[in-house]
Amino acid sequence: MKKQIFTLLCACLMSEMLFAQSTWFNDKDLTLTGVYYYPEHWDESQWERDFKQMHDLGFEFTHFAEFAWAQLEPEEGKYDFAWLDKAIALADKYKLKVVMCTSTATPPVWLSRKYPEILIKYEDGTVLDHGARQHASFASPRYRELAYKMIEKLAQHYG
């Protein structure tokens, strides 16, 4: 008898849980899925294929420009958004939303060479150099100034 009551109780709970899940969550409230994509690392002729595949796989958004400061500002004060405009247009064509990143994790080589004071310096005197991510010090006023300018240009162009 106890076994039958337990089985009946479990069956009721299971059906309630399944019913509740179907009423609690509808598609529009579920987490969106996305992918990081670095168009600056791929030949432009491959972009459309890649965006189509993202769409076909069910991705809903992509991140751009996370590590692209050197492509956005190849020389100090000279900005190039043409390549990124093309990538955004293709993302839009395939119904992908774009999360625009600020590129501050990877300063361009010209910045590290012209302003070495922006580089992280450890207590033992070791100085990080260009060639890895996160080698600039957020404590550096010069770095913050130049990062702000780049972010401002990005915002002006896409805002």
Predicted feature descriptions by range:
Residues C10-C12, C101, A136:
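Generic recognition of cysteine residues
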Residues S22-Q46, Q53-E60:
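An acidic-aromatic substrate-binding cleft motif
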